[in-house]
């Protein structure tokens, strides 16, 4: 199952609710993405391993590193991404989930994690492994990795909106 929606509509909150409802019946592995805000603006993102709770800052407007991805608006400061952090949390947690979990949680497939070739490869492996997955993704992103996920016949996509997020 994929949960899509615009930024801020509650995709992460929705998958965490689902995970909490089923975690006593199924082992869950993977990661979640959490924005870091300062004065209402997103200045970075933490990635968190769902199983271990390990969390690491993986993107920040304060880092002058490559790769850099654009902010939400043309005026926004681009985010510098630490691929080592992406690989340590996102890639490793999904790889471990392929081996050990009943359900693979990937929150979120987007510009942050898709900059990592290692993550893209392990996500493709996860999609082929036959285990159920719970994925969040931006509704309109043209990212090639997201486009390939959207085209899958074996994936059901639900859209989170400001109106339905409270009931999902």
Annotate the PLM regions.
Residues 3:
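Hydrophobic anchor at the beta1->P-loop junction of P-loop NTPases
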Residues 7:
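The conserved Walker
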Residues 11:
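Conserved lysine of the Walker
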Residues 14, 18:
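Hydrophobic positions on the alpha1 helix immediately C-terminal to the Walker A/P-loop
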Residues 20-75:
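N-terminal phosphate/diphosphate-binding loop that engages ATP/GTP or pyrophosphate donors
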Residues 28-30, 105, 155-159:
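Conserved beta-strand scaffold positions in the cores of enzyme catalytic domains, especially
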Residues 66-120, 124:
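Phosphate-binding/switch loop-helix module in NTP-utilizing enzymes
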């Amino acid at each position: 199952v994929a949960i899509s929606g615009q930024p801020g509509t509650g995709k992460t909150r929705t998958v965490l609710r689902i995970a909490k409802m089923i975690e006593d019946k199924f082992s869950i592995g993977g990661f979640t993405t959490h924005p870091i805000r300062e004065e209402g603006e997103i200045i970075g993102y933490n990635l968190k391993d769902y199983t271990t709770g390990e969390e690491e800052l993986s993107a920040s407007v304060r880092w002058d590193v490559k790769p850099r991805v654009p902010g939400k608006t043309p005026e926004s400061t681009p985010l510098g991404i630490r691929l080592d952090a992406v690989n340590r949390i996102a890639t490793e947690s999904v790889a471990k989930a392929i081996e050990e979990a009943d359900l693979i949680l990937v929150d979120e497939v987007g510009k942050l994690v898709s900059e990592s070739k290692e993550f893209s490869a392990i996500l493709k492996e996860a999609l082929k492994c036959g285990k159920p997955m719970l994925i969040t993704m931006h509704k309109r992103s043209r990212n090639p990795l997201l486009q390939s996920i959207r085209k899958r016949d074996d994936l059901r996509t639900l859209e989170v909106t400001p109106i339905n997020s409270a009931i999902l």
